[in-house]
Amino acid sequence: MSFETKLEKYARLIVQSGLNVQEKQTVVISASIESYQLVRAVTKQAYIVGAKEVVVHYSDEEVTRMKYENMEVEDFNHVPTWFSSFRNDYALMNACFLYVDDEDPEMLAGIEPKKISNWQRAVKKACKTYFDLSDNMTNAWCIVGGATQKWANKVYPDMSNQEALDSLWNAIFKAAKIDDEHDPVELWNQHRRSFEKRVNYLNSLNLKKLYYKNSKGTEITIGLNDDYLFAGGGSYLKNGVYNFPNIPTEEIFTSPNKDDVEGIVFSSLPLSYGGNIVDEFYLRFKDGQVIDFGAKEGYEVLKGIIDSDEGSKRLGEVALIPYHSPINELKTLFYNTLYDENASCHMALGIGFSECIKGGIDMDKKELFEKGVNDSLVHVDFMMGTEDLMIDGILEDGSHVKIFENGNFVF
């Protein structure tokens, strides 16, 4: 199968399953200029299913780097009105949003972390309408991968440029279940059904806590909210439309009780954040809050994440992914959270999910917070799963039920 045919299948999957574009709906795409082939393919498929308009916002990594090198720290506290209006206005128009995750993992290496954290915090505040409508399941959004040269060279450093780029595209296609024989949309419908048994079982247990332990030193107990819900695969929006926010996805996840986390967790894979790498780090929690942390690489970046606001010191997500997931079986370190988080159990600092508590999508931020769901301007996933990870569920009477053994589900 030619690259063009694979790209067409991938684009169709993104439009029909990732975003589930509805007739007369506007589609907004954000991508780097290197991803123009994928953007054009998605645009074509979106119009085929009846999109009203496809709006594309391109970025250039070299220009972005120059911006961070030359602007002052305080300049990153200001978001231009055109930028915030672009997101907020299209969100109010019930547009759906596609993000092509294609950046160089080290695009902003060496840049003062305060510049990065200031900009990300300012964007969250200025684009509050957009983020609120995404968080409360009003607008569909989807993040997908697109191979670019610098990212490919980081993942496959011993290959030529073309070999590395081809290899990364092949890994992206394989992770998205793109092959010669099958309709990818139907494969993802089957994938959706594969989550249901485990999600339903976890929701039936009435768990009070999760207990994690592995040989890296992780030993942590995480409380769950009274009305917790696990979710997995895709999500139902308020209007009943089902979409997959991430392609690929292998995770089953929930939002824990923000005030009930005790113990220490060690990372198992590098974290690529804001164009920087954070590696070999740990977080220690007491009463739900990070009280100590360290990192062999990227300490200041990690500190910037944790210090973003009050909620960035607490967990908003725990996600269960078997060690032998299809993504991990690729035996590739992607230096990209979208892919690496689906190869490993992970947790996230920052905001939790409204869909992870009963009735949550109809609650406002204050109500969710009172129910125990964390709130923050950030949501940063980090990988902590290992081949020997053990996870027990703890019931109300204190008894344990096995969830994970040797890195994989026991059911």
Indicate where each model-derived feature is located.
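Long, well-ordered mid-to-C-terminal structural blocks that present hydrophobic/aromatic surfaces
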Residues: 253-310
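A short secondary-structure junction signal
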Residues: 109-111, 153-157, 233-235, 276-279, ...
